[in-house]
Amino acid sequence: MKTTLYFIYLLFLVLLFGCNDTKIKREIQQLQSKAISFPYNMNFTIHGRDTLISEYVENGLKLVIYTDSVECSSCVISKMYLWNSIIENTELYKDKLKFYYILSPQRQHIEKVRSALNVIDFEYPVIIDTLGKFAKLNPHLPENKALHTFLLDENNNVILVGNPLRNKKIEEMFYQIVEEKLGKPE
């Protein structure tokens, strides 16, 4: 009897994790099914102040770090400094690799987000998507926030999904893909 219960429990765990794996694969395939679109009039912010950057959406590789309205934007902002090492490691690629930090906070949190961005020591532009345009243009974005960081090729097709800060393998793949696409840094 104990053996049968143990076997059923083990089978349940295998099915549970197997289904989760299948769901993640399906979400990644969905994300890769269409190119990512960017709104034409994105508001960039540096240190909480609006900045006009007209040439930002252009050819080249793009790493998108997207935070939707469900996530805690202030929590994400407080950890943005962690990206500094990856930015520094890729600075030699100059304009061939861009980083897109897209925050889509709830309306009632917009001022709090701007204040938090003003305080942090983060020199890179951040997009505050107050109207949720990014998500509307990309209905194929998965709900799973672990899949909200992705690398795009020059045509905005997703070529890597995952956060290089949270997964060493993703980090290695990120640098490998960047080097394959852009060559060795100058």
Predicted feature locations:
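Sec-dependent signal peptide recognition
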Residues: 2-10
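Short active-site neighborhood of thiol/selenol oxidoreductases, capturing the structured segment around
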Residues: 53-77, 83
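Thiol-/selenol-based redox modules, centered on thioredoxin-like
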Residues: 145-146, 151-186
